[in-house]
Amino acid sequence: MKIEKVICSKGRTGFYFDDQKAIKAGAKNDGAAYIGEPMTPGFTSIRMAGEAISVQLVLSDGQIALGDCAAVQYSGAGGRDPLFLAEDFIPYIQEVVAPHLIGRELTSFKELAGEINSMTDPKTGKRIHTAIRYGVTQAILDAVAKSKHTIMAEVIAEEYGCKVSDKELPVFTQSGDNRYENADKMILKGAQVLPHALINHVETKLGKNGEKLLEYVKWLHDRIIALRKDESYQPVLHIDVYGTMGIAFNNDLEKIADYMKTLCDAAAPFHLR
C-alpha cells in the first residue's frame, strides 16, 4: 500500500504558546492571559492560542491516516525551534516534506519515520521543525497500522522488538495555572502522575524562599488523602519548576537540595519528582 496524497489543515492545540522569557522577566497574569509585551521572536502577545497542523495521508485503498503537528508551550525558548504557526508551516510541509512521502510504500514505520526525523531544511541545513517531525511520523505510524489492519501499538511492538503492555500505563496530567481546582479533578479521576502545576515564576508561584510551592505541596498531600477512595491510590507528585529554584536560591546547590528535601518531606508518603 502506498501514500497517494498529503493534506494539511490548521488546528488548535490543547494549551497555549507562552513567551517564557517575558514571563520570567515578570509578566503578570490577567485571567488566562498575561499583561506586558512579548520578548521572544514570533510572539504577538505573551500568551497565544496554541496552533497545530493536522496531517492527513490518503492511502491507495482510500483510507486516511492522521497525525497532529504540535509544538511545546515554551516555543522559541532555550534554543528550541521557533514558534510553530500553521500559516507558516503548512506551505513548508507541502513543498519540502510531502514530495518525500507521496508514492512511498508503507512497509516499515521505523524506516520511513527515521527518514523524516533526519530530514534537513534545504536552505538552512538544519533538521526540520520538531513539530513537523512529531506530527508527520504520527501519521506514518497510523498509515502503516492501517495498511496492516492492526493498531499502532502493535506496529511499534513488532518493529522495535517489545511487547504491548497488558497493564494500564501511568498518565502524567497537567493543571496549568488553575493548579488547585484541576488537581481536585485529577485526584477524583485517579490520575497516576500529577499535577505539573506550572511553577514558572519565582515571586508569584515558587515564593522568594520557596514558601509558596511548599504550601502548595502540603495542600496537595492533604487533598489527596481527603479525596481518594482508599489508601491504594498513591499518585506520583510531579512538579515542573522551570529553573525557578536556581533563580530563588542563586544557584546554590546545597540550598536547592535542602529545599527539595523539605518538599519531599511535605509530600510523603507520596513520591515527589
Positions of PLM-derived features:
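Short, Gly/Pro- and small/polar-rich lid/capping loops
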Residues: M1-Q56
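Extended, Lys/Arg-enriched charged tracts that mediate electrostatic binding to polyanionic substrates
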Residues: K24-G36, V144-K148, M152-A157, G161-S165
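Short alpha-helical segments and helix-capping/turn motifs at coil-helix boundaries
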Residues: M39-G42, A52-I53, Q138-A139, M152-E158, ...
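Solvent-exposed loop and beta-edge segments used for protein-protein assembly and interaction
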Residues: R47-A49, G135, K163-S165, E231-Y233
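Metal- or metallocofactor-binding catalytic centers and their adjacent structured scaffolds
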Residues: V58, I64-T150
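Short, amphipathic alpha-helical segments
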Residues: K126, T130, Y134-Q138, K146, ...
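Metal-dependent enolase-superfamily TIM-barrel catalytic cores that perform enediolate-based chemistry
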Residues: V171-R273
